[in-house]
């Protein structure tokens, strides 16, 4: 058995999987070869279980395809193997817009000795109600959740820094607190600080005013994990950026975990120095997208359960179908429904919800129309709306038309026949085919996935 077998498998998997997925799960695996066997080693149990559940059948089929009857038996284990027995991929996956993979650091800060110094009292600000257990997973946040789990299990060693970006109310803050709670559950004395970026600025200003900048630096550079929300507010604050630049470097050199969030991709943050934006992408950068319909329903059902309220599934579906922009909006709507139900004593049904949320629903329906979707898609692809309505079948027109149909089904309450009629009198089966095709392409093509997400953000903002 030679290393070339696993290299061939890696090459095939890299071709088949999205770059971010390959880099997060497959590339870090290490292979040990035995007598007619191959053992794949994962860094921790979470990664091992994920890889075994998602990729076992495909890896075995590749072994059979390459080796035939001589295919090795595949085993999994947690840990690392000696260098001589280990093979990793030495070709890097191409970066994509929503996930970036960079170098990882392997030693948690609290396993290495620190210089002796007086104890500093760190106020964590971690919200104990935000945990991994009550975070609702969906396709839109799956990678971010997986990376957050790994960071909580191995702070300073899994992905450092971890940079999460996406629109308001999509769960970035929840994940920050969940990581903080996860770290402290494993290491109760860990110094974990959560903060908004504005607090870092305010603390620095106070330190300068009080001639206490060294104490400020010591405070922030002696943490085990620093979790900063909304890093985009550092924009145009040169002195704060300078201080954070040195804090960032000190933490990274000390193998101390950094997690940052923003409403946009690092390189798109205006007013932040290039050297900082470059460092933001050194570890792992992941986008969190607006939740899909099934996840929105699951969020509502979970929230209702937490409030000990019976929410009929059809009511959750009714709300989720109409409110699509973010989790915060969904939870706010449900809170209003619950408050109205408790005040009036009426049962929660669709008519009750329609009345309780009439202003929110009216606004949402006014904002997103099929006509608006058609104009937005046409502008995005630099074609004419008339092209979307025409009989033209060239890929440059057909694909945007399918995307627009899928968006109309996702973002409006129109039936398939109504959507088809709005696209040049097409049959409802054409719309159904378009929706299924786009769903497939979002799984297979990073370009289509990114286009769809960009259009959703534009139409929902």
UniProtKB/Swiss-Prot annotation:
Compartment(s): Cytoplasm
GO molecular function: ATP binding; ATP hydrolysis activity; DNA replication origin binding; lipid binding
Pfam families the record matches: Bac_DnaA, Bac_DnaA_C, DnaA_N
Major localization listed first in the record, in broad terms: cytoplasm
Ligand binding (ATP): 169, 171-173
Matching CDD domains: AAA, Bac_DnaA_C
NCBIfam families attached to this UniProt entry: DnaA
Matches recorded under InterPro entries: AAA+_ATPase, Chromosome_initiator_DnaA, Chromosome_initiator_DnaA-like, Chromosome_initiator_DnaA_CS, DnaA_C, DnaA_dom, DnaA_N_dom, DnaA_N_sf
Species in which this protein is naturally found: Tolumonas auensis (strain DSM 9187 / NBRC 110442 / TA 4)
Recorded name of the encoding gene: dnaA
Protein name (database record): Chromosomal replication initiator protein DnaA
Keyword Cell division among record annotations: no
Subunit structure as annotated in this protein's UniProt entry: Oligomerizes as a right-handed, spiral filament on DNA at oriC.
